[in-house]
Structures are given as C-alpha cells and as structure tokens.
Amino acid sequence: MMFGRRDRFEYVCCSGCGALSLVSVPEHLGVYYPPEYYSFDRPVLELRRPLAAAAKRARAAVVLKMPPSIVHRLVAAGRAPVLYDWVAGLGLSPSARIVDVGSGSGSLLADFARQGFTRLLGIDPYLDDDAASGSVVLRRLAIDELTGSWDLLMFNHSLEHVPDPPATLRAARERLAPAGAILVRLPLADGYAARHYGANWVGIDAPRHTMVPTHDSMKILAGRAGLRIKRIFYDTHSQHFWASEQYVRDIPLLDERSYCVDPGRSMFGPAEIAHWDSMCRMLNEEGRADAAGFVLVPAKDFA
C-alpha cells in the first residue's frame, strides 16, 4: 500500500511468539523497491565546518559517558538528538567503528557525522555505487561480505527486510569487536496499533517486511544468534496511526491525499495528529509501542 499497488500477501502468525512471517516472498521483490523508495531518495549530507565538528565531538564524548536514564531525559527535553538515546550506555566514543547495515543513501549516518562521529560505514547490496562524504563511507555490500570488527552494528529498520534474520544476526555477531554491540530498530507486531488495525497496520509493509517480530520472538531470535537483549527502548511515532487510518480508507502512504505528501489535503487536522503524538509518547513510556530498539550483546554461554 505504500505505492498504491494494492497487491495481496499472506502472513502467518506464530502461535507461540506472535511474530508475523511472510508466507511466500515474491520472486521479483525488487519491483517493490522503486527508485523513489524512501531509503534511497535522500542524499548523504555531512557537517563540514571543522570548528563546529570539533565542538560536536567534544559534546559527544561527554554525552556518551552519561547513564541511559540521563541521556533519555536530555533527548526528551530536546537538548540532545535522539540518536544518543539509541547508543546510550554502550561505552562508545566519537571514534567508535560504526556500520549501518542496510544504510540506503546514508542519511542516518550523516546524522551521526553531524554529532562528531568519525568512523562511519554504510553497507547496502542495493546501492548503485560506492560513495563517500567526509567521515561517511557507503559500500555496495551484503553483511557476509563485510570485513573487520566493529564497535556497533546497526539495523535501522532493515533486519525485517532480510530473507534470513537469524543468519544475518549471526553474521553481525561474528563481526563484533570485543565489548561491541548490535542495535536493531524495527516495528513490533505486539504493539497497540498493530493489534488495533490488524491487516491495515502500516508496520506490516508487505511484502518488503519478510517478518515483523514481537518481544518474545526477538528474545528467541537473539538467542539463536548467540546474543542476548541488554536494553530495549521504544520509539513509535504517529505514522503508525494516521497511515493505518489511511489504509483503512484505501489511501496509500504516498497518495496525493496522504498526510506525509500534503498535510493540507489530508483528512487529518492538527488536533488529531497531536492526539496521536500524545498517544505515542504514552505508549513509548509504557512499553506498548509499535516500534522499538533492541540493544544486543554476545551471550557469554553461547558456544
């Protein structure tokens, strides 16, 4: 429904953990990732003022040493970018080796670069070509082609797209530096909006999402890869509501009437969006959100 194709796909819900899995992956999955797909439509941007970059690195070094609870309050108050909430408590430094798996055009890595991080790699097998901009390097690679060891491997809404998530996480674990961590951000099938909207929930994103996990299935998935969950944070947003409401009304995400295309033509007014924003803040605080970040570290007893 993102592009209005209205094709139908079948998912099975695990009776044990509640995760959703795509029954049959389309033979030509690439047609569902057209050039305008949002992961590839934003150029890499980089902070290029040396003095400003030095100041950002100094601030990053301070914030990265703070406990996650304090970092969360800074982010909630608008005094620090949200990416610090993701990496809080991991012992990273601005020179940490960070790779974003399924990086698309690298816009998220550019956000890290603006905050003073200096060793940033994005890998994506669907990139047209390798590219570089300042401290951000993009390479056309799959994770099993990645070499070296890394302090942080990130899957920012990419793990749910791969055909074999357990194998992908095992490959990530094998590339971790000592004391390294894996960050997985993705939708959750046991969240409030997922249960409320069912097949019209935007988080399914068929057929691009080959699976949509739950809390229980993430624990199982991590264990199969020799990992354990160190921390969970929640970051759902109002799109889970207004986009799902559009799907109920047969309005695709990128339709001219969609809120994300033209808020002025949307059926939703500021009061409704504000209400959903408020609901999302509540769901995030209560752990009932439809999107979360899982910080994974090696399980010590894994052989």
Could you tell me what each predicted segment is?
Residues 80-200, 207-224, 291-300:
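Conserved SAM-binding loop
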Residues 1-57:
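N-terminal juxtadomain amphipathic helix
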Residues 216-235, 269-272:
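A SAM-dependent methyltransferase catalytic signature shared across enzymes that methylate proteins
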